[in-house]
Amino acid sequence: MALIDADPENPPEGQVKMDPIVDNFIIGADGVIGMSKDTGNIPLEVPAVIRGIAKRKVIQRCKEEGRDWYYIDTGYFGNGKTKLYHRITRNNMQYTGKIHENCPDDRFVQTGVTLTKYRPGDCILVCPPSQKAMNYWGLDLQEWLKITVDDIKKHTDRPVVIREKAGRDVRVNHDTMEMALNRNVHCMVTFNSIAAVESLIYGKPVFTMGPTGTNAAEPLSNTDLANIDNPFMPSMDEVRNLLCNLAYQQFTVHEMRSGYAWERLNNNVF
């Protein structure tokens, strides 16, 4: 069984706001679709299924109760103008589990993603999250941005470019991350965004400044801004292997409904 956390804001009278992506995951898990804004009346053995970082209060309640929760959000890579892939993690918001050294590459190849070799550049690209994402961590976006940029400038004279998170149409059609990273970028600095994975894909070192153990790119990222001028850049083989692992942690809606996603998440063997 599984619980959806829904926040039915002004649903039609007598109806409950549903989420078809979450529904398909629960169907594939042979679960029962239930709706609740709270977990108080739900048996502890029933896991919660949560989509989107705005559900921070329910996530915190699950942690306090010791309840398993499955988190669904945008996939790490392989999405074009439509969101084909959705990442799903258990008791975390990004995959930070074991990175298998000889992970099969079949799912990575299916995404059609091509890696770019490391290319030197001059400017530092800072990619802050949205305030909504920062709310989860109890942080103010502008305050974090000022502290981070000030810290960067203590260690380098390189120009700093801030790329605020725009709407999806802009990010997908007019100013993609690939375009941004092609503009003479030396490295990326972000808080906890999956943009860190994209930075590695397009051949740029990345600094992840969020809490340890919360970013999927962390095994290959930098964390100390004192190294901003000479950051660690993993090999293409290391990046490819990380992506092969992450490809097994993101799923299509069809894979959710068929039960494949549930099986992978609970029987993580190759």
List where the protein language model places each region.
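N-terminal pre-catalytic "stem/leader" segment of glycosyltransferase-like enzymes
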Residues: M1-A48, G52, K132-A133, G259-F270
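Short loop/turn segments at strand-loop or loop-helix junctions that form parts
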Residues: L3-E9, I72-Y76, G121-A133, R163-A166, ...
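Short acidic, S/G/P-rich loop/turn micro-motifs used as interaction or catalytic elements
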Residues: P8-E13, A54-K57, Q131-N135, G167-R168, ...
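Short, well-ordered secondary-structure micro-motifs within conserved domains or adaptor modules
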Residues: K37-E64, D68-I72, V185-N192
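Donor nucleotide-activated moiety binding/catalytic core segment of transferases
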Residues: K37-I42, K153-F207, P211-T214
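A short, gly/pro- and small-residue-rich
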Residues: A54-K83, K146-I147, I201-N215
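Leloir-type glycosyltransferase catalytic cores
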Residues: T82-D122, A216-F270
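Conserved catalytic-core segment of nucleotide-activated headgroup transferases in glycan assembly
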Residues: R119-D169
